[in-house]
A protein has these predicted regions:
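A cross-family phosphate/adenosyl-ligand binding-site feature
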Residues: 2-58, 166-197, 225-241, 245-266, ...
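Structural signature of the thiamine diphosphate
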Residues: 4, 21-22, 64-100, 126-178, ...
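Active-site diphosphate/adenylate-binding microenvironment
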Residues: 8-19, 26-29, 34-41, 341-422
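Glycine-rich phosphate/diphosphate-binding loops that line cofactor/substrate pockets in enzymes
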Residues: 10-20, 61-66, 151-156, 194-209, ...
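Thiamine diphosphate
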Residues: 33-107, 269, 274-278, 386-423
Length: 423
């Protein structure tokens, strides 16, 4: 019995090893060996799309919940159609694998007019991805796929593209090319020195502020403990729900509200955890943030990108926030008068937003009443994305309120489909 399998089957088996449950895509002559193998084996659900942007968007949503989304597209125009959705996944730091085809090896980069050929496909994939790879030999295909998955799942996560020439996809290789999945390295533990410095800053502050971003999505328990201890919490739109709106010290995502800005000006410490401090949440970086400002991010390149920090801590938000929460006593920073000011400011911010939203506030309330308490809201951009959906609609847990971070229009429906399948 031969141990030979096609590269397409080797890729399908590899994805199964990574416990991929769904692949989103469009079947084409330039990816048939992979699509055939997935279909014939029957272990991965293939979800067809009407366009490549929709396929990658569905995979993006799936990856946000499952830890790895997978999309399959065609060469040239097909891969190009995926670019906008890849940019969204890049903004959201979604662990996503985008597999696309290429013309036969003999015609690569020849600009010969081969069907589906485009100039510098790898170049535009690099521009919209965390990493992009080309498979140059059949024997290396599985290794490159594993490298791509490792890159996608390594924090900070992101979409990774792999292009595979069609003749390589159909080539036969020994099943010995298959190997065990490679897991990302564990995140670093919080250093005692960094935790001690954070604790001393927190101890000295009377009105500390915690600003959360998408990099803190897995930190809900630590954030709640800090809020219970008296720390005021505000989040990016992507970070909403890490601390439920119902918590009395949650400023939600009311960054641009005058009443909330008045609260921020009274804080005497800002701890930024896993946030880019994006332009639309900081009035294009003119919003004054309380000093001292300490930034926690796993990515050293995040340091001082938009605001000059008094201290940058390169590390895992979860490890550092958990260690800090363990040092604070319950209610250590609680102040009844301060809590009353916070409650008034939140009420004023919500009232002003309801007035600004007009009839949309009624739509918001109707959806909230119809949706189960643990239901998920997925929305498009424009009014639902930028006004009532991002700030008024309730958020009770991380990723319960999905939106476009890149500002792309039209991603709502495929994002909702991917979210539903992942859940």
């Amino acid at each position: 019995m031969s141990d030979k399998i096609t590269v397409g089957e080797a890729i399908a088996r590899t994805l199964e090893q990574y416990e991929v449950s769904a692949m989103y895509g469009i079947i084409s002559i330039h990816n048939l060996p992979i699509a055939d193998a997935v279909g014939q084996r029957g272990n991965i659900r293939f979800v067809p799309a009407r366009g490549e942007a929709g396929a990658v968007t569905m995979a993006d949503a799936h990856g946000r919940f499952s830890g790895l989304g997978v999309a399959l597209t065609s060469t040239g125009a097909g891969a190009g159609n995926a670019v906008g959705a890849m940019i969204e996944a890049l903004n959201a730091n979604t662990p996503l694998l985008h597999i696309t085809g290429q013309v036969e090896k003999a015609y690569l980069d020849a600009d010969a007019g081969f069907i589906h050929e485009t100039r510098d496909q790898l170049g535009f994939l690099r521009a919209c991805s965390k990493r992009a790879y080309r498979v140059n030999s059949a024997e290396q295909a599985v290794a490159v796929i594993q490298r791509a998955i490792l890159d996608a799942q390594t924090v900070p996560c992101g979409p990774v593209a792999v292009e595979i020439p069609i003749d390589i996809q159909s080539s036969l290789v020994s099943s010995s090319v298959l190997s065990q999945p490679v897991a990302p390295a564990p995140l670093p533990a919080a250093s005692d020195e960094a935790v001690e410095r954070l604790y001393q800053r927190m101890k000295q502050a009377k009105r500390p502020l915690l600003w959360l971003g998408g990099g803190a999505l897995a930190c809900a328990d630590a954030v709640r403990k800090l809020a219970d201890a008296g720390v005021v919490v505000i989040s990016s739109t992507h970070g909403r729900g890490i601390l439920p709106d119902s918590h009395p010290r949650s400023l939600r995502a009311f960054h641009n509200s005058p009443s909330i800005e008045a609260i921020l000006t009274q804080c005497d410490l800002t701890l930024v955890a896993g946030s880019r401090l994006r332009s639309n949440e900081t009035r294009t970086w003119t919003l004054p943030l309380p000093r001292p400002l300490v930034q926690i991010d796993i990515d050293p390149a995040a340091a001082n990108r938009n605001y000059l920090a008094d201290e940058q801590i390169n590390g895992d938000c979860g490890a550092l926030l958990n260690a800090l929460a363990a040092r604070l006593s319950p209610g250590e920073k609680v102040n009844a008068e301060w809590d009353a000011e916070i409650a008034t400011a939140i009420q004023q911010a919500e009232s002003a937003l309801r007035q600004q939203s007009g009839e949309y506030a009624k739509l918001n309330d109707a959806i909230a009443a119809a949706l189960p308490q643990d239901g998920l809201l997925v929305r498009d951009i424009t009014v639902s994305g930028s006004v009532w959906g991002s700030r008024l609609f309730r958020a009770i847990s991380p990723l319960c309120n999905i939106h476009s971070l890149a500002g792309a229009i039209g991603m709502g429906l495929p994002m909702a489909i991917g979210t539903a399948i992942a859940n």
